[in-house]
Amino acid sequence: MSAAVEIQHVHILGAGRMGQGIALAFAYAGLRVTLIDFKERDPAARSAFAAAARGEIVRQLQTQVVFGRITEAQAAETMARIVIVDRERAREGLAEGEIVFEAVPEVMEAKQTAFAWLGEHAGADVLFASTTSTFLVTELQQVVVHPGRLLNAHWLNPAHLMPLVEVSRSDATAKETVERVVALLRRVGKVPVVCAPSAGYIVPRIQALAMNEAARMVEEGVASAEDIDTAIRTGFGLRFSVLGLLEFIDWGGCDILYYASHYLARAIDPRFLPAAIVSDNMREGRDGLRNARGFYDYADVDVPAYLHKRLGEFSRLLDSRGLAPVFNAVSVSVSVSASSVPNQTTLAVSKADYGPR
């Protein structure tokens, strides 16, 4: 098997919040899902947990109904694709399974137990994707029998809504495993990115730095928590939903980041010193758009068309958030006095109310 289109049935090991969100993402896209409650429970507790998990998924679907994204019938159809079972009932289906997303608690012993159990009951061709945000794929591959069939697939919460899934592979991961998982994720509307086995993947690593810096600013009295969050929502966050971080370095010019970083390092802390690659780009003239090379190569790019596209995306985003600049009439009277200095124009400007911003 080589094409993700062949995958029609997804198993998810671990029925907590992340497992429920992933189950909803696949069921919403039309796939059958078996959500496995892996924790040992007595019959009453097992039944209660399954009911609670099902109730939470239904609540998420009802939210989409309220927002007008789906109908009641579509919500019911989505829910009908999800079966919640305990580990005993899951065994038979796993033997004929296609892919398992592991979503048990972030404890290595729990991961080891889960993969040992999967090794006993999953079929020979089943692919494994751990949703861990903590352990490297290289660490998990040490506890599985077939490391070539394992990779990490890190979803962001809420999993059924956030498009990004960070796929982390190692040299031991088979190329076909990566291709099939990436194709499957794209098929259900996700946006997979592939990264090396590195602590924090991409988003959590950048996010941790940004969140800690925001916390430090509160600590230092730079601004209130509310104003910092407003700045992020209406500035930083808006900008980087259209432009990537590295794309923005090229957009403004590497020199801006380079000199700003040195200033902040002197004024605040050496942690702000630029990355070595930023210094290298400065030295080698890879300054971004202005000389057609930076983190990206713009030699064959129609730069005016590219800029127009990005600005259009940004304008539409501002419109959708109610943050677009407000245009109101400005009356301008122009008079030229006979006694005035030649070519001197006197402007009288009265500005109307510009409205809320």
PLM region descriptions:
Residues 1-60:
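NAD(P)+-binding Rossmann beta1-loop-alpha1 motif at the extreme N-terminus of oxidoreductases
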Residues 6-9, 97, 125:
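Phosphate-coordination loops involved in phosphoryl transfer and adenosine-cofactor binding
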Residues 99, 104-165:
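Rossmann-like NAD(P)(H) cofactor-binding subdomain of soluble oxidoreductases
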Residues 2-6, 190-197, 220, 225-337, ...:
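NAD(P)-dependent Rossmann-like dehydrogenase/reductase catalytic/cofactor-binding core
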Residues 31-32, 146, 165-198, 210-238:
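Internal alpha-helical scaffold of NAD(P)-dependent oxidoreductase catalytic cores
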Residues 38-97:
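Conserved N-terminal Rossmann-fold NAD(P) cofactor-binding segment
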Residues 34-36, 83-85, 101, 129, ...:
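Hydrophobic/aromatic beta-strand patches that form the interior of the parallel beta-sheet core
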